[in-house]
């Protein structure tokens, strides 16, 4: 009696033979196989089809956003879509006033920033100093949701 180890556990076999030829070792037994060849191949085919159908799809992100220059890389900042870190280039705004600006949006015009009840008088003075450097473009979901924390850390 022999024990043959398979993926499904050990199988008891009355007799087993092992022979060698040019292609390698071959093992034979007198018992029925635990898994038929047809079941094994159809399972492998099903797994391959499932893997092909579940492959990753490309992101449908918009890469040609017309306001990209106003997100912090230029001289002007879009108050509706720019991240809070974009205000670092304006002394006195980052982080406190910038956070209040970002959380108070969206704005119709840059002047609407001054209507934010969270701003102190000092914040408003500093904002007025840079008012000509702000634009208010329509909020876009791709950037509006990441204004406070866009996940980029330096």
UniProtKB/Swiss-Prot annotation:
Q: Indicate whether Plastid appears among the record's keywords.
A: yes
Regarding how it is modified after translation, the entry says: Predicted to be translocated into the thylakoid lumen by the Tat system. The position of the first transit peptide cleavage has not been experimentally proven.
Membrane topology label: Peripheral membrane protein
Return the Pfam families for the record: PsbU
Q: Which GO terms describe its biological process?
A: photosynthesis; photosystem II stabilization
Q: Where is the transit peptide?
A: 1-36, 37-61
Q: One GO CC term of this entry?
A: extrinsic component of membrane
Subcellular location as annotated: Plastid, Chloroplast thylakoid membrane
Which SUPFAM superfamilies does the record match to this protein? PsbU/PolX domain-like (SSF81585)
**What does the UniProt keyword field contain?**
Chloroplast, Electron transport, Membrane, Photosynthesis, Photosystem II, Plastid, Thylakoid, Transit peptide, Transport
What are the disulphide bonds in this sequence? none
Q: What is its main location?
A: plastid
What is this protein's function? One of the extrinsic, lumenal subunits of photosystem II (PSII). PSII is a light-driven water plastoquinone oxidoreductase, using light energy to abstract electrons from H(2)O, generating a proton gradient subsequently used for ATP formation. The extrinsic proteins stabilize the structure of photosystem II oxygen-evolving complex (OEC), the ion environment of oxygen evolution and protect the OEC against heat-induced inactivation.
Q: Which family does it belong to?
A: Belongs to the PsbU family.
Name the record gives this protein: Photosystem II extrinsic protein U, chloroplastic
Q: Which organism is it from?
A: Cyanidium caldarium (Red alga)
Q: Which gene encodes it?
A: psbU
């Amino acid at each position: 009696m022999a024990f043959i180890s398979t993926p499904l556990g050990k199988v008891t076999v009355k007799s087993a033979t092992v022979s060698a030829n040019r292609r390698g070792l071959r093992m034979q037994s007198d018992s029925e196989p635990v898994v038929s060849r047809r079941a094994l191949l159809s399972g492998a085919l099903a797994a391959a089809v499932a893997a092909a159908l579940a492959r990753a799809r490309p992101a449908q992100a918009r890469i040609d956003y017309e306001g990209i220059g106003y997100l912090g890389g230029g001289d002007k900042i879009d108050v509706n879509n720019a991240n809070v870190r974009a205000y670092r280039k304006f002394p006195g705004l980052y982080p406190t006033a910038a956070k209040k600006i970002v959380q108070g949006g969206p704005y119709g015009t840059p002047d609407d920033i001054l209507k934010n009840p969270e701003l102190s008088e000092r914040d408003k003075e500093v904002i007025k100093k840079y008012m000509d450097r702000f634009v208010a473009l329509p909020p876009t979901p791709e950037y509006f949701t990441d204004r406070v924390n866009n996940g980029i850390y330096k």
